[in-house]
């Protein structure tokens, strides 16, 4: 491992952020810290993850939502101090890593099936040999 990777891993450990497991197709709620003058508040951005970019400290993801009939996409840096929390609302069942095709779709054709049996997977614990 080279020096840059070591420094990035130390920085990630220092940030001590808990990041949930999410994938493209999942519906997430991203709570963003917004500063307006002297006031600081949380703003929720709820949408579908259409892309995920894993690059260590520079990891990011794109969330798409429809607001007032207009498609809105926002790119978030995973380890940004502006992100208060990421909450996975619903797991999506998709077969692609990048869901850019959703940009050209609207209505029912833009819907994503929900992945069933996700809660059962979390409950399974490894069996210990006696």
UniProtKB/Swiss-Prot annotation:
Report any Pfam family annotated for this entry: Ribosomal_L19
List, alphabetically, the GO terms of the cellular component aspect: cytosolic large ribosomal subunit
Q: Please give the Gene3D superfamilies that the UniProt record associates with this protein.
A: 2.30.30.790
Superkingdom is: Bacteria
Gene Ontology molecular function terms on file: structural constituent of ribosome
List the GO biological process terms.
Answer: translation
Keywords in UniProt for this one? Ribonucleoprotein, Ribosomal protein
What is the recorded function of this protein according to its Swiss-Prot or TrEMBL entry? This protein is located at the 30S-50S ribosomal subunit interface and may play a role in the structure and function of the aminoacyl-tRNA binding site.
The entry sums up its family as follows: Belongs to the bacterial ribosomal protein bL19 family.
Instruction: List the protein's name.
Output: Large ribosomal subunit protein bL19
The uppermost taxa in this organism's lineage are: Bacteria, Pseudomonadati, Pseudomonadota, Betaproteobacteria, Burkholderiales
